Amino acid sequence: MSKSLVIVESPAKAKTINKYLGSQYVVKSSVGHIRDLPTVGSSTGEKAKPISTKGMDAEEKAKIKAEKERNALVKRMGIDPYHDWKANYQILPGKEKVVSELKSLAKKADHIYLATDLDREGEAIAWHLREVIGGNDDRFSRVVFNEITKNAIKQAFEKPEQLNMDRVNAQQTRRFLDRVVGFMVSPLLWKKVARGLSAGRVQSVAVKLLVEREREIKAFQPEEYWEVAVLTNNQNKQAIRLDVTDYKGKKFDPKNQKEAQSAVDFLNVSDYVVTDLETKPTSSRPRAPFITSTLQQTASTRLGFGVKKTMMLAQRLYEAGYITYMRTDSTNLSQDALNMARTYIENHFGAQYLPEKPNFYSSKENAQEAHEAIRPSDIRALPESLEGMEKDAVRLYDLIWCQFLACQMPPAQYDSSTLTVTAGDYTLKAKGRILRFDGWTKVLPQIGKNPEDQELPSVTVSEKLALKEVQPTQHFTKPPARFTEAALVKELEKRGIGRPSTYAAIISTIQERGYVRTENRRFYAEKMGEIVTDRLNESFGELMNYDFTANMEDTLDKIASGSVNWKTELNQFFKDFSSQLSKAELDELEGGMRPNSLVETDIKCPTCGRNMAIRTASTGVFLGCTGYALPPKERCKTTINLIPEAELLNVLDESSETKALMDRKRCTKCGTAMDSYVIDAHRKIHICGNNPNCDGYLIEEGSFKIKGYDGPVVECDKCGADMHLKLGRFGKYMGCTNCDNTRKILKNGEVAPPKEEPVHFPELKCEKSDAYFVLRDGASGVFMSAHNFPKSRETRPVKIAELVQYRERLPEKLAYLADAPQKDPEENEAIVRFSRKEKKQYVTSEKEGKATKWIVDFTNGKWVERKK
């Protein structure tokens, strides 16, 4: 009897689904996308035959050249916007084996179920699978489920659907738009600004947000202000701290020490009389169940997870069947989910924690209500009971579990008190709050202490308080806060830029391109990021407009719902975009994109005597001779490195940013904070932070010490030279002063051990591609990974039996592993694991994918079984 074939996109998901389907189904994974538009540099078809231009005039030759360049561009992009958006999809490298297996299984199957994820990306994967496998469309059915549970899968297979081509076309539209912008604008940036630059339809808009915030911070001028607090005692000698809030009926707002001291002098001799004590009930409602953006934000603030890590862990939890689908913008909960939560609350917390009716939360206008919020698949699966999940995945599940319960619990109830005291013309206040009923905070306590969470001492109206001390405090206004990953996601969501499925990719891409970087989990715009943003803003105003980008997301939603035609929208976009691109490609004098400008200075070139200019490259700011613009034979290539005078503003913590801004010189032309660099022992240059848009700079002469390197030093394991601490786009690392060797800085601040050359095992083939395994030794011990990483990212633990078989290939430091037992007492294969706590490798085993309790340690030169 033939079986039905079920195709999903991940092995973990296939493993979970397989537990719930009967023997009449064969469940296989496509391991993500199986085909895509061509990668850069891939060859597609035969090369076009050259066209002879002999005898043609200049206009005809230019026309032939333009046609040739256009055809080459279309070939690289893999889509042809000039001919009805014809796409050249190709099987992804390394996926040939997967495709061959799926085709073979499909031939034998009586029906094929495409069970990829329920979002547009999942719909597109399903469509690509159907297109590649081929055959009658009637053989294919689409099944979707919001959670990988027995009941959800049963319902999905009872009511299979057809592929939704509107959703597929929405995904293709997004892909084509991004492809066009990236492939057609990036070469322009290479030509006009600097080689190696790139642009993205949504990513460039996200960078714009960060650049604007960077400039707000640099332009910000801190202003002084003072606060005055008064420490008093009531008649029972209980301490009460009062803040001065008003003076003569207006807000108390001293701008300097003189104004503050005037108040202090009066308050030191004044009487303090209680004039009012108001107590009223207040409450704190629970937040809605998680959607993608709020999960990312809360995981960042409560757990310290980055957006990418949060989504990776959520994906694993979903594929293991523990939570519902993690890419959603809907706060909707099914009736079954509500019943599950309410039953659990009543049984485990009591009736007082159960509202009369379920709590409902509104979703944003374009949210897909068919989707649910992120919640546990089964509330009875407690965090500590999860099997096969790493520690951080369990922590994330615990957060989701608690938020789901909290959202269906009553508000926390407080008694909030405000004490008002007068001292002459001054009004002082103290606030307190007492928790009367914890409500939802029973399962999800609020983080951070509220300064009002105190019980005010007992006082009566007209009571006089005894003065203990008057405390004036100087403050300075703070610049706008820098974006964290979580805050940036919140801002993107608020502006309607991107969707739940794209936030993580946007955050990752803008960091990888080098236009921004993160330090202490906060974003800093690099100078090149500012320049590229300016050029794109000037030449592609509509593309960089926040509202236009948000409206395009709405258009994609309309395509997905079948309201508008996808190619009509693509054609309209391309028409407008092509017009802007043509203008941008012109010379600057004709209205084209401005080149990467320089700022000429009075500093003379030490080689030719011409003026030096402030230039910006991807690596930073430097001085370059203006003679570089001359013809090759006369060209002067002299450059001078600029050494930052001290730690730059962008490596300081947020609390220090105000002081740093105050200490920096201000540009006399635009008022922006200046960056200071040492040129040599006798000169320093202060450059406007808004360079090159502002040509302000200042030369300071004197005697300056060029600070040498005084950081940590380790010996290079390749050449023996010193390795120094450096800062790159992905954070701190150790770099050799002599060769190109680098070493990571671990999360605990230690320098990672030297990188060992991988040991190749061509005999050990990967399961997911045609690659073979190599043995790598990293910061977390040894492991097997594909030899062509990162093209193939397949990894697995090292088996002792393999090390024994190929002992002669092992480096001396790893030879001891080959002496470990090859199997446990139950004949399960022994594998190598690494203990982060003890920082050493040990041997254990697995049975049916789960770790056994058998552990062997290497102690005193021999392998010893650990006592249970």
Swiss-Prot record:
Gene Ontology terms: biological process: DNA topological change
The leader peptide range reads: none
Site positions (Interaction with DNA) are 33, 174-175, 178, 190, 327, 513
* GO cellular component term of the entry, any: chromosome
Region Interaction with DNA, annotated ranges: 198-203
Q: Where is the Topo IA-type catalytic domain positioned along the sequence?
A: 164-581
Annotated family: Belongs to the type IA topoisomerase family.
Keyword set, alphabetical order: DNA-binding, Isomerase, Magnesium, Metal-binding, Repeat, Topoisomerase, Zinc, Zinc-finger
Q: Which cofactor does it need?
A: Mg(2+)
The UniProt entry, under HAMAP family, shows: Topoisom_1_prok
The cross-references to InterPro entries, in alphabetical order and at most eight, read: TOP1_Znf, Topo_IA, Topo_IA_2, Topo_IA_AS, Topo_IA_cen, Topo_IA_cen_sub1, Topo_IA_cen_sub2, Topo_IA_cen_sub3
The chain positions of domain Toprim read 3-148
Function field: Releases the supercoiling and torsional tension of DNA, which is introduced during the DNA replication and transcription, by transiently cleaving and rejoining one strand of the DNA duplex. Introduces a single-strand break via transesterification at a target site in duplex DNA. The scissile phosphodiester is attacked by the catalytic tyrosine of the enzyme, resulting in the formation of a DNA-(5'-phosphotyrosyl)-enzyme intermediate and the expulsion of a 3'-OH DNA strand. The free DNA strand then undergoes passage around the unbroken strand, thus removing DNA supercoils.
Known catalysed reaction(s)?
Answer: ATP-independent breakage of single-stranded DNA, followed by passage and rejoining
Q: What is its EC number?
A: 5.6.2.1
Segments forming C4-type zinc fingers? 605-636, 667-694, 716-739
Name one molecular function that GO assigns to this entry: zinc ion binding
Q: Which organism is it from?
A: Haemophilus influenzae (strain ATCC 51907 / DSM 11121 / KW20 / Rd)
What assembly does the database describe for this protein?
Monomer.
Domain of life of the organism encoding this protein: Bacteria
State what protein this is by name. Answer: DNA topoisomerase 1
Summarize where Mg(2+) binds, as residue positions.
9, 117
